[in-house]
Amino acid sequence: MNIITLTPGQLSLSQLHDIWRHPVQICLDASAIDSINASVACVNDIVAEGRTAYGINTGFGLLAQTRIADEDLQNLQRSLVLSHAAGVGDPLDDAMVRLIMVLKINSLARGFSGIRLSVIEALIALVNAGVYPLIPAKGSVGASGDLAPLAHLSLTLLGEGKARWQGEWLPAQTALKKAGLEPVALAAKEGLALLNGTQASTAFALRGLFEAQELFASAVVCGALTTEAVLGSRRPFDARIHAARGQQGQIDAARLFRHLLTETSAIAESHHHCNKVQDPYSLRCQPQVMGACLTQLRQTKEVLLVEANAVSDNPLVFADAGEVISGGNFHAEPVAMAADNLALAIAEIGALSERRIALMMDKHMSQLPPFLVKNGGVNSGFMIAQVTAAALASENKALAHPHSVDSLPTSANQEDHVSMAPAAGRRLWEMAANTRGVIAVEWLAACQGIDLREGLTSSPLLEQARQALREQVAHYTQDRFFAPDIACATALLAQGALQRLVPDFM
């Protein structure tokens, strides 16, 4: 099991990916302890001196003007968690819950939240023991933070709600006991510190980014395969074309295509002296389109990596000045906009792939048998597989609608502009599944097309891509039940079967 020594605010993208993919053991770096303790001391001083500070000894939201008596401060924090755990929908899977928990730990341990080290350590203990709170997928608008999801996370700390341990849903008290853990009691400000933040929104969008990286790589490989299958030209990938424009994403995408295709192949030599002048845009403009998508992936990475290491609590404790200041770092607008831009890239990756599939279906464009099968008429070949790809690509056009421009006031208009970042991130998962289905069909089709160039082979890397599929899915000599082949190709893509052929591009 991977062990991560957490220096707050310094998680890398590769660490975040590992946390999402696999159970981890978290160890908090000792350098964080002093700032954590200092922020708690500042909160304690405010309570002892009788000063009024939001979230410490006041109500919340529109009730912020209500002063809370000292004897009710613990109950205030517990009541906050219980009342805000109002999410709905299917439970998030363990991977997503684990990522949210580590993001929360990372933020709290920065030392601006006024939460005791013992509470942070209790969260770390949940992660290390594999106790995953039941967090419903829906219920946050991404300001004031992800209140409902993070409240459900916090319930388990209190011994309330449900949690999963070793694959079984249990009452939280039972799960804690089986894992050798105890519930905690919250002190002043701690409930609010746990609930305020963009950790669910950020985790949702990070999963979308991780899946988009796999989709981008897979689509580049399949685009190169299709270029070979339909006797496309390598000339549009010439580095000089892309340097003349200067768009870095485009330059780098073209480099990936050159890496995969190499200078030539037996297939390329077979049509070296053909009469074709230009290929259709879905082949010729791959570096331009995929390069633009790559730029979006990179920009999304920058935003999300900052947010994953950010302090998005409110109010913030500045212990060196003895101040507690209310602000708006809980507003997840940066995450929402990043997710919206990523949605465009995921949709376009699938849309371009679908157009290449359609090209292969047309015997005049592909110079292959109609629908990639011999004895057409008796056999329909890839006819309906292309329709499926079209349906998936079309769904993504609607799903790509921006969420960050939507807002509904909440909390009696106190919270009158929200980000909708959770929905913006969560829909990326469905979009990624759709695009993966499209790319799976293209992989099947392109390999079939190359098979039909009998006696000819592609470049070494593209032959590896074809072999990876052919080890699981046979060539089509006649019609057969098609859906299992799409499912198999889709599963292989999700496992990184094609991604591993592509050098790092992020």
Swiss-Prot record:
Superkingdom per UniProt: Bacteria
Entry keywords, A to Z: Cytoplasm, Histidine metabolism, Lyase
Family matches, as InterPro entries: Aromatic_Lyase (IPR001106), Fumarase/histidase_N (IPR024083), HutH (IPR005921), L-Aspartase-like (IPR008948), Phe/His_NH3-lyase_AS (IPR022313)
Sequence position, cross-link 5-imidazolinone (Ala-Gly): 143-145
Listed EC numbers: 4.3.1.3
Family matches, as Gene3D superfamilies: Fumarase/aspartase (Central domain), Fumarase/aspartase (N-terminal domain)
GO biological process terms held by the UniProt record: L-histidine catabolic process to glutamate and formamide; L-histidine catabolic process to glutamate and formate
Catalytic activity from the UniProt record: L-histidine = trans-urocanate + NH4(+)
Involved pathway(s): Amino-acid degradation; L-histidine degradation into L-glutamate; N-formimidoyl-L-glutamate from L-histidine: step 1/3
One GO MF term attached to the UniProt entry: histidine ammonia-lyase activity
Post-translational modification: Contains an active site 4-methylidene-imidazol-5-one (MIO), which is formed autocatalytically by cyclization and dehydration of residues Ala-Ser-Gly.
Pfam families the record matches: Lyase_aromatic (PF00221)
Enzyme class: lyase
Location(s) in or outside the cell: Cytoplasm
Post-translational modification 2,3-didehydroalanine (Ser), affected residues: 144
Ranges that cross the membrane: none
GO CC aspect terms: cytoplasm
PROSITE patterns assigned: PAL_HISTIDASE
Family the UniProt entry places it in: Belongs to the PAL/histidase family.
UniProt name for this protein: Histidine ammonia-lyase
Gene: hutH
